[in-house]
A protein has these predicted regions:
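Rhodanese-like catalytic fold shared by cysteine-dependent sulfurtransferases
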Residues: 1-22, 26-145
Length: 148
């Protein structure tokens, strides 16, 4: 079976069309942290078969796999097809092609939740204190609650 590919531009459109999509990065965890698409979920190829079902329980779900353009995503697509997933595509050229098309690559892990927290802080002006202020509050036995 030939692996379907999607261009970076097509993937960008898929991510914004409102339909269900699972964007899975099949590189190993360290590689994922070095740079990935914003809403990609890490699913290392080494854990593919043991971890796919909790992430994508419906075998007809639309799945796009990304990698470093080194063929790992194609191997993962073939394996997913073999175990019954029917709508699997690969990002043509991997993350490098995504970046070359002018789209952002994000470093680190849990980026969407960190981004959300920063947006909430910016928009709603959530209160924050410095380490020095916290030490002074503790020294004065002030009653406080810290939410991190």
């Amino acid at each position: 079976m030939t692996t379907r590919t999607v261009s970076p531009r097509d993937l960008k459109n898929l991510l914004h069309d409102g339909a269900e999509i699972a964007l899975l990065d099949v590189r190993e965890e360290g590689q994922f942290g070095e740079g990935h698409l914003l809403f990609a979920t890490p699913l290392p190829y080494s854990k593919l078969e043991t971890s796919i079902t909790p992430l994508v329980p419906r075998k007809s779900a639309r799945i796009v796999l990304c990698d470093d353009g080194d063929g790992v995503a194609q191997k993962a697509a073939a394996r997913l097809n073999a175990i019954g997933y029917s709508d699997v595509s690969v990002l043509a050229g991997g993350n490098a092609a995504w970046a070359a098309a002018g789209y952002a690559i994000f470093k680190g892990v849990n980026v969407p939740s960190k981004l959300f927290g920063e947006l909430v802080e910016h928009v709603y002006g959530t209160p924050h204190i410095t380490v020095t202020q916290l030490a002074e509050m503790k020294k004065a036995n002030e009653d406080f609650v810290i939410v991190d």
